[in-house]
């Protein structure tokens, strides 16, 4: 029961879309209505409002980190086990992808996944972030960097901790993240994907 309750709480935390919340508070258009239509920091940046994009990035990452950290810190005393913690990690990610508060129209989950990984293990999170930065620096594609980081994240965890239930959760998160980038994959293959720094009209 504890596992389910913590997972439900994590899903609700993940369902808070900071792209939508920040945009509304700052008088910007709904991120679903322009650019890629994705409620995430990259799309919010297309408005030209860097502050809004940064706040969105921080908020989405923080909710992933907070849900897992709180569960790991206080959950065991209430009956949460390793399987439950893995469920929490997956649930907060699913909340971001399919938010109940925003008609289940969520983002792609890159920032939230980063927060989750940092909470599971800071070294794991930083290693995955370093992978993103390296690919982004050399190729200038945010989506490609996210895809490569998603592929490596489960392997990093297994190398550090072996095959466990959390490895399974991270693998599922990675698969879902890659699936959410299917349009980006098509654009990358067609040579039509936007590079980092390019602006699109809102």
Curated annotation (Swiss-Prot):
Keywords: Cell inner membrane, Cell membrane, Lipid biosynthesis, Lipid metabolism, Membrane, Phospholipid biosynthesis, Phospholipid metabolism, Transferase, Transmembrane, Transmembrane helix. GO terms for molecular function: acyl-phosphate glycerol-3-phosphate acyltransferase activity. InterPro entries: G3P_acylTferase_PlsY. It comes from the Bacteria. Its EC number is 2.3.1.275. It holds the Pfam family G3P_acyltransf. GO terms for biological process: phospholipid biosynthetic process. It is a multi-pass membrane protein. The chain crosses the membrane at residues 2-22, 82-102, 119-139, 158-178. Pathway: Lipid metabolism; phospholipid metabolism. It catalyses: an acyl phosphate + sn-glycerol 3-phosphate = a 1-acyl-sn-glycero-3-phosphate + phosphate. It is found in: Cell inner membrane. Its main location: membrane. SMART domains: G3P_acyltransf. GO terms for cellular component: plasma membrane. Belongs to the PlsY family. Probably interacts with PlsX. Catalyzes the transfer of an acyl group from acyl-phosphate (acyl-PO(4)) to glycerol-3-phosphate (G3P) to form lysophosphatidic acid (LPA). This enzyme utilizes acyl-phosphate as fatty acyl donor, but not acyl-CoA or acyl-ACP. This is Glycerol-3-phosphate acyltransferase. It comes from Cupriavidus taiwanensis (strain DSM 17343 / BCRC 17206 / CCUG 44338 / CIP 107171 / LMG 19424 / R1). The lineage of its organism: Bacteria, Pseudomonadati, Pseudomonadota, Betaproteobacteria, Burkholderiales. The gene is plsY.
């Amino acid at each position: 029961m504890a596992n389910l309750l913590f997972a439900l709480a994590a899903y609700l935390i993940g369902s808070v879309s900071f792209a939508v919340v920040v945009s509304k508070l700052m008088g910007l258009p709904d991120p679903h209505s322009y650019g890629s239509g994705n409620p995430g920091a990259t799309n919010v940046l297309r408005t030209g409002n860097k502050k809004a994009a940064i706040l969105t990035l921080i908020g989405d990452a923080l909710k992933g980190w907070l849900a897992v950290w709180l569960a790991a810190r206080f959950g065991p005393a209430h009956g949460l086990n390793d399987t439950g913690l893995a469920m929490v990690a997956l649930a907060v990610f699913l909340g971001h992808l399919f938010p109940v508060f925003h008609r289940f129209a969520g983002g792609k989950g890159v920032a939230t996944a980063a927060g989750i990984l940092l909470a599971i293990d800071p070294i794991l999170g930083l290693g995955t972030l370093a992978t993103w930065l390296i690919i982004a620096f050399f190729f200038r594609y945010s989506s490609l960097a996210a895809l490569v980081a998603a592929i490596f994240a489960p392997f990093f965890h297994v190398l550090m901790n072996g095959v466990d239930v959390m490895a399974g959760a991270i693998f599922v998160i990675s698969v879902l993240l890659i699936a959410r980038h299917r349009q980006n994959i098509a654009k990358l293959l067609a040579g039509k994907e936007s590079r980092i720094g390019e602006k699109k009209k809102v």
